[in-house]
């Protein structure tokens, strides 16, 4: 797999996607330009087909956002809306709710109702951890008018975050407004909150329909072309960032793996048995809308274009946060089968199974249809690179992409995909999961806390 190193186009793709095109919010011009570039590069790499699949995306944008103190108008308070924050302009006394744990909310009682509340995103120490989305729901139930959420990262950094649960909730337009402030400004507001100062939160935002653009390319199999595997990753970013790590790294991982496998076929005659599909998604940062549109079109029982399900989806997201350690499955029945294939590579790669439903990347729309889906084992589980602790923020620039490790990803992914493609479809373990099974698992896990770093 030396082609992953000697013929690497990573720096070329990084320059175009991160520096030339830049931010690629789903439904924006940057999203469209990225899709066109990816399609052109897949064609140039010699894949059998490379197309753009457009879809209607329920998107959002914001204008001016501010947190101000009417009695101290010269004081500048950092502000950033949560994604899909509704427009709001409200002034109330400030109420500090700490971490918004149950005992803190109960103790404040009616003071929360109709007030702007200040809450730490970090969970309360020595208590059962719960996601901030659950604490947002608690504050909404208590009648808060708006939340100022304190960013846990230091040094004035702030990253876009989501207000709502992704496991069983579609994109919202009427959720409680949440605006983030920096750790430093949050500490200042905590200091003055004991005096209940007046505070104003203003967000100019709108919801609109636009056109998102997925890319779908394919190398046809030689023995079972009617069945396929799929390698995917989202090419969109949040607003205002080039997304070097999240997810230019995963996008280029898809592109480079496709190029390497295509080159093996054209130069050495080594071709996949089953077809291998390579996709990049728009709208991941907006409730996985691109991957959901693809699954609805290709695999929904009600779709006139329905085709056979992929035998496995492998999702690439934030690859620069750690080197490849293996594959993590959503369902357990493929564990021994995939591990046996990894063992033939003799690189110590391991196959594991998630113990919960994870809706935070583009494998999940496949999971919802009970399709076998997985992601690479990297930062979510062990060994996150500290210098790559960037995703939904301006600092996630081109220099956050780890070029050397991405070459390794492309080589390793090409090897595992080729091995899997040459296993006769009938020899794969049968998938016993149903959509009903998955829905029960989603309901079981919705609102729960699942550590991302363990």
Kindly label every feature range from the protein language model:
Residues 12, 261-289:
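Short helix-loop-beta-strand segments that form the rim/entrance of peptidase-like active sites
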Residues 1-5, 19-29, 81, 94-96, ...:
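Second-shell loop/turn segments in exported
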Residues 186, 281-385:
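Metal-dependent peptidase/peptidase-like ectodomains
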């Amino acid at each position: 797999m030396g082609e992953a190193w000697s013929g690497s186009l990573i720096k070329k793709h990084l320059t175009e996607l991160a520096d030339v095109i830049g931010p690629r919010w789903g439904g924006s011009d940057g999203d469209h330009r990225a899709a066109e570039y990816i399609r052109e590069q897949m064609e140039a790499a010699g894949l059998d087909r490379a197309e753009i699949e457009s879809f209607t995306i329920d998107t959002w944008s914001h204008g001016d956002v501010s947190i101000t103190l009417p009695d101290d108008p010269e004081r500048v308070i950092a502000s950033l809306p949560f994604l899909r924050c509704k427009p709001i302009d409200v002034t109330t006394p400030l109420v500090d709710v700490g971490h918004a744990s149950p005992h803190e909310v109960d103790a404040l009682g009616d003071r929360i109702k109709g007030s702007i509340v200040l809450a730490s995103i970090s969970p309360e120490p020595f208590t059962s951890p719960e996601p901030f989305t659950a604490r947002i729901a608690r504050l909404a139930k208590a009648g808060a008018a708006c939340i100022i959420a304190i960013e846990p990262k230091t040094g004035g950094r702030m990253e876009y975050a989501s207000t709502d649960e992704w496991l069983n909730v579609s994109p919202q337009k009427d959720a409680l407004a949440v605006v983030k402030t920096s750790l430093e400004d949050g500490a200042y507001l905590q200091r003055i909150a004991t005096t209940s100062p007046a505070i104003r939160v203003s967000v100019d935002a709108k919801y609109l329909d636009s056109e998102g653009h997925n890319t779908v390319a394919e190398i046809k199999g030689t023995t079972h072309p009617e069945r396929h595997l799929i390698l995917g990753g989202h090419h969109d970013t949040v607003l205002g960032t080039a997304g070097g790590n999240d997810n230019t790294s995963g996008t280029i991982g898809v592109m480079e793996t496709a190029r390497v496998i295509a080159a093996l076929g054209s130069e050495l005659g080594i071709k996949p048995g089953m077809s291998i599909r390579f996709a990049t998604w728009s709208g991941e940062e907006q409730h996985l809308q691109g991957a959901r549109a693809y699954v609805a079109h290709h695999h929904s029982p009600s779709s006139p274009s329905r085709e056979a399900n992929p035998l496995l989806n492998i999702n690439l997201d934030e690859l620069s946060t750690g080197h490849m350690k293996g594959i993590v499955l959503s369902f357990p029945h493929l564990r021994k089968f995939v591990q046996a294939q990894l063992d033939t590579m003799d690189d110590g790669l391991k196959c594991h199974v998630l113990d919960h439903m994870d809706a935070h990347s583009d494998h999940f729309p496949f999971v919802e249809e009970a399709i076998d889906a997985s992601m690479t084992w990297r930062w979510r589980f062990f060994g996150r690179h500290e210098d790559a602790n960037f995703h939904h923020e301006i600092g996630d620039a081109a220099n956050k992409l780890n070029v050397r490790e991405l070459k390794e990803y492309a080589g390793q992914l090409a090897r595992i995909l080729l091995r899997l493609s040459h296993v006769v479809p009938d020899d794969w373990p049968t998938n016993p999961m149903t959509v009903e099974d998955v829905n029960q698992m989603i309901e079981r896990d919705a609102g729960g806390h699942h550590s991302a770093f363990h």
